[in-house]
Amino acid sequence: MSSTTLTDDQIRDNERTEVLAKATAAKNIVPDIAVLGTGPKNAILRAAADELVARSAEIIEANASDIEAGRANGMEESMIDRLALDESRIEGIAGGLRQVAGLTDPVGEVLRGHVMENGIQMKQVRVPLGVMGMVYEARPNVTVDAFGLALKSGNVALLRGSSTAVHSNTKLVEILQDVLERFELPRETVQLLPCQTRGSVQDLITARGLVDVVIPRGGAGLINAVVTGATVPTIETGTGNCHFYIDAEAKLDQAIAMVINGKTRRCSVCNATETALLDAALSDSDKLAVVQALQEAGVTIHGRVAELEAFGATDVVEATETDWDSEYLSFDIAVAVVDGVDGALAHIAKYSTKHTEAIATQNIETAQRFADRVDAAAVMINASTAYTDGEQYGMGAEIGISTQKLHARGPMALPELTSTKWILQGTGQIRP
């Protein structure tokens, strides 16, 4: 072994030292970034957008290294799609920064307030969270989204991306730091953490006192590991095992179009439809029409073969228990027949990740029952699951879709990246 070769323990020690050093540097600049004015923040975001486009060739070259390594290591094409960057996607990422620049700055917003009987003026205002850690998988666009939303909301970003996107993320952060430096702001406003081992994730999520919040974004394994292992507060952006229930009183052509859109528009994202639930009261021909339309769109059907063959379906892959709670992220979908809206609700309650659940029906009472009783961050009534998206909501870019119930639920946009502070201004009052 060469004298310059590091042992596994030395690599871990170096990673731990680097994570804690970067977290400390981030914590030290929190007071300055928290009070940065809206004008400077917007100027930085717009300059960063321009710089990303201007240096797109550098980004694409770095990204090509990641894609080459991914394919060499047998990465699935759905994951390659998440990883890939081209000029069009870089323009889209830059557009996201410009959009964030145009959004209302949440910092300092007065949520409520009044004058107390003794004359003290009190108000509750939005303030940044502080040091915001992000742990995410092979989606380099998250690097820029996290920076933009963190900066606009007055937060400092610590980013722990995937080793599969290390070249892309390194180049993106380098460009963002160059822009910050041009505006005489610390490069530590956004930092990329090492990703040689999984231990660096543990270093980040246990850096209590240095890191104020950690937001995991990725598959179920990653999210569970972060949430269960963290001593730092976390915001869970859950996986998307999204269901689409087609009621007997749905407009069938409309329902088919929505379920195909939810499945095929972009199958590798968390708002993709993963399970179609068919009302048993639908005619056999209507059930078959749904399945065949999905197959014609290139989607593989998983289900109880006997159940689906009973209404004429063919080429069905026998489903196991895993299929019902899977986030496929591919051109696969699970299909089941259920006993009306209550059957759909029961199935969803058992397998849902509480992300997005949808219903197609023309019956107002059925739609209301579904919306009232389903437990999810978003409920779609006669709309595709693909609409669960911060930009579609008019909120701009998002960190992720929170599926938990505390602090925030749904798209994590600017207001969701703040906390609050109570400010009381008196004239010398003392409490009796």
Curated annotation (Swiss-Prot):
Transmembrane stretches, start-end: none
Molecular function (Gene Ontology), one example: NADP binding
Disulphide bond pairs: none
Localization annotation: Cytoplasm
Catalytic activity: L-glutamate 5-semialdehyde + phosphate + NADP(+) = L-glutamyl 5-phosphate + NADPH + H(+)
Keywords, sorted A to Z: Amino-acid biosynthesis, Cytoplasm, NADP, Oxidoreductase, Proline biosynthesis
EC number: 1.2.1.41
Gene3D superfamilies: Aldehyde Dehydrogenase, Chain A, domain 1, Aldehyde Dehydrogenase, Chain A, domain 2
PROSITE patterns: PROA
Pfam families the record matches: Aldedh
Any one of the GO CC terms: cytoplasm
Primary localization: cytoplasm
Enzyme class: oxidoreductase
Pathway field: Amino-acid biosynthesis; L-proline biosynthesis; L-glutamate 5-semialdehyde from L-glutamate: step 2/2
InterPro entries linked to this entry: Ald_DH/histidinol_DH (IPR016161), Ald_DH_C (IPR016163), Ald_DH_N (IPR016162), Aldehyde_DH_dom (IPR015590), G-glutamylP_reductase_CS (IPR020593), Glu-5-SA_DH (IPR012134), GPR_dom (IPR000965)
GO biological process, alphabetically ordered: L-proline biosynthetic process
Stored HAMAP family: ProA (MF_00412)
Described function: Catalyzes the NADPH-dependent reduction of L-glutamate 5-phosphate into L-glutamate 5-semialdehyde and phosphate. The product spontaneously undergoes cyclization to form 1-pyrroline-5-carboxylate.
Family that this chain belongs to: Belongs to the gamma-glutamyl phosphate reductase family.
Protein's name in the database: Gamma-glutamyl phosphate reductase
Organism: Corynebacterium glutamicum (strain ATCC 13032 / DSM 20300 / JCM 1318 / BCRC 11384 / CCUG 27702 / LMG 3730 / NBRC 12168 / NCIMB 10025 / NRRL B-2784 / 534)
Lineage, broadest ranks: Bacteria, Bacillati, Actinomycetota, Actinomycetes, Mycobacteriales
